[in-house]
Design a protein with these regions (language model features):
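Thiol/disulfide oxidoreductase modules built on the thioredoxin-like
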Residues: 74, 81-128
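Short pre-active-site segment immediately N-terminal to redox-active cysteine/selenocysteine motifs
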Residues: 20-22, 26-30, 97
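Conserved segment of the thioredoxin-like fold in thiol-based oxidoreductases
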Residues: 43-85, 95-98
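A short beta-strand-turn-helix
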Residues: 1-22, 39
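Short acidic active-site motifs
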Residues: 9-12, 64, 85-89
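Conserved N-terminal glycine/acidic-rich loop preference
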Residues: 19-22, 71-76, 123
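Conserved redox-active cysteine motifs that mediate thiol-disulfide chemistry
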Residues: 26-43
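Hydrophobic, well-ordered secondary-structure elements that form the walls
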Residues: 24, 65, 101
Length: 131
């Protein structure tokens, strides 16, 4: 779901950032590890202004998701998976923990697939290599 209530397929979401290195964060407003990691995400954004950031929420309701975006002042593209962690999207990426970070290079190739909140050094290192 998009922030204006529309629907978008994951492949179309990826097309929006074609030609740019992209960090996808899978998160939820109720996830304490996600909230704790927000300052690190903002630091990544400040250090890598050339990178597109896409946030995919696992929240159960759009109200909580949208409130979480505003509360944490998240900058980037925002989407909500309608079926939470165990749904189609979660199963497709073998989602077992959030936050989850996925990095795509400028061609759309996945270069980092299973990073979590403890992997910010690896995330930063990967982004530096893609400059």
């Amino acid at each position: 779901m998009t922030t204006n209530g529309g629907q978008i397929a994951f492949k179309d979401l990826l097309k929006n950032h074609k030609g740019k290195t992209t960090v996808i964060e899978v998160w939820a407003s109720w996830c304490s590890d996600c909230v704790k990691a927000m300052p690190k995400v903002k630091e990544l954004q400040a250090n890598h202004p050339e990178v597109a950031f896409t946030f995919i929420s696992m929240d159960k309701t759009a109200d909580k998701w949208l409130a979480g975006i505003e509360k944490h002042e998240l900058k980037g593209a925002h989407y909500m998976a309608n079926d939470q962690m165990k749904g189609v999207f979660g199963q497709a990426i073998d989602l077992d923990w959030i936050p989850r970070y996925i990095i795509l290079d400028k061609t759309g190739k996945i270069v980092l697939y299973r990073a979590i909140e403890k992997d910010f050094d690896l995330i930063n290192e990967t982004l530096n290599k893609l400059k």
